[in-house]
């Protein structure tokens, strides 16, 4: 009998165990599609990014012109640039939905997988931030200045740290050069860490909407979920093409069409939409160090979620109180996103402060209380 290469070849065997014969719960829903969509986003961003890097010049006097050159003179350069810029937005949409799924269905109980996922989120945010600086437009320059300046709030070493990051006494050529180097490097680190994320996931197997062990009812990943993933890819790529071809600048800031000018500050400095919720939390505290700590806490709080799980059930499927809180949290994050895009004036200041307070209140206090109440109501 001939050897089955798929199951015996050292490399093919690994691929087979992860993508073909992987035992998968039979009832996972569309919310489990976003992991593979993130993989597609990463591959697409690395591909388009590589093509852009071939024509981009990381120098303050040439960066803005080189991006214009890509859009005007390079074959399909406009398309590559639009796919890359809007691909970042889709990357964040997918990762936020992926995290939301993890929160709702208790996937965070796979602690290693969850913690690596949070590190991946932080790396993605860093990559997007340094990437936004590269076109060297007004918002690129001032965004870099404002956000890197936050490190100066760190006591004792802050100012030294900022000047070390800048490579001088302000955001200038050395800053742009190193940001380009980091923007090129980080996606490959993300790809490596994604494999670790998957390795830990495949140790325990996927969670499912009921939050119960599914060992008794597993089906092979291929063809059932491979075809479902391909449908997800098609839908996402259609939406991305729609955005990149018809309204490529919808999510961008018009200010970034002006070349960077250190002598003229834009009236409203704000990051891309996917950072606005964190930016609103940062702005809601009228103290530099306090704001920076709140900004860091807004993401790092996710590390505490598995420790605060007090329910006897894993998923929120049969927990109405927790469901109400979950959707309140989603609404809260949308409010923060909106407030982050508004100027710092009444009533946005107080709305931002209330939304920031309730963000931490729901995650750190109300979720555990609701879980304990639900246990009592069900006499668990």
Swiss-Prot record:
The chain crosses the membrane at residues 34-54, 78-99, 114-134, 179-199, 227-247, 289-309, 321-341, 348-368. It is found in: Mitochondrion inner membrane. InterPro entries: Cyt_b/b6_C, Cyt_b/b6_C_sf, Cyt_b/b6_N, Cytb/b6-like_sf, Cytochrome_b, Cytochrome_b_C_euk/bac, Cytochrome_b_N_euk/bac, Di-haem_cyt_TM. Coiled coil: none annotated. Heme b b562 binds at residues 84, 183. A ubiquinone binds at residue 202. Its cofactor is heme b. It is a multi-pass membrane protein. Pfam families: Cytochrom_B_C, Cytochrome_B. Keywords: Electron transport, Heme, Iron, Membrane, Metal-binding, Mitochondrion, Mitochondrion inner membrane, Respiratory chain, Transmembrane, Transmembrane helix, Transport, Ubiquinone. Binds 2 heme b groups non-covalently. GO terms for molecular function: metal ion binding; ubiquinol-cytochrome-c reductase activity. CDD domains: cytochrome_b_C, Cytochrome_b_N. One of its GO terms (biological process) is mitochondrial electron transport, ubiquinol to cytochrome c. Heme 1 (or BL or b562) is low-potential and absorbs at about 562 nm, and heme 2 (or BH or b566) is high-potential and absorbs at about 566 nm. Component of the ubiquinol-cytochrome c reductase complex (complex III or cytochrome b-c1 complex) that is part of the mitochondrial respiratory chain. The b-c1 complex mediates electron transfer from ubiquinol to cytochrome c. Contributes to the generation of a proton gradient across the mitochondrial membrane that is then used for ATP synthesis. Belongs to the cytochrome b family. PANTHER family: CYTOCHROME B (PTHR19271:SF16). The cytochrome bc1 complex contains 11 subunits: 3 respiratory subunits (MT-CYB, CYC1 and UQCRFS1), 2 core proteins (UQCRC1 and UQCRC2) and 6 low-molecular weight proteins (UQCRH/QCR6, UQCRB/QCR7, UQCRQ/QCR8, UQCR10/QCR9, UQCR11/QCR10 and a cleavage product of UQCRFS1). This cytochrome bc1 complex then forms a dimer. This is Cytochrome b. It comes from Lanius ludovicianus (Loggerhead shrike).
